[in-house]
Swiss-Prot record:
The lineage of its organism: Viruses, Varidnaviria, Bamfordvirae, Nucleocytoviricota, Megaviricetes. Disulfide bonds: none annotated. Coiled coil: none annotated. InterPro entries: DUF34/NIF3_sf (IPR036069), N-reg_PII/ATP_PRibTrfase_C (IPR015867). This is Uncharacterized protein R836. It comes from Acanthamoeba polyphaga mimivirus (APMV). The chain crosses the membrane at residues 6-26. It is found in: Membrane.
Amino acid sequence: MNNIDILILFFVLLYVGIAFILKVYINRLNGKNIDKLVLSDNIKIVIFVPETHVDIIIEALGKAGAGCIGCYDYCSFATKGIGRYRSLEGSSPTIGNINEFTSCEEIKIETICPRNKVAQIIRITQKVRPYETMGYDLYPMLNLSNNF
């Protein structure tokens, strides 16, 4: 197992615990059974990039198989924000200088991908990223079954 596989396993196990707690809590609130809430086959991926690289990243995500929802592909959502960091000794910052605090406009790209393609999609995206270190988040997703 590599580090990404271990991270994915951690998030799946985390989901199982959270899903159980949510089921118990919601059942107590309204007495309804939510057993039809199921773990999705997809993972939500969130990536932070400068505005200049949004199209490059979205293209890489789509080509790798991310962003498929029903009869649509290349699906994503983007929001603008401010990224903040300090580059430490030994780094090669794309924006800013070593040992200085830097703030820059970034775009947060959100999309989904099949759980079995997460590691591949992250590796492909890391090849086209502009930053030395790519910031990203992975979230397990819940869906309602068709009979709910």
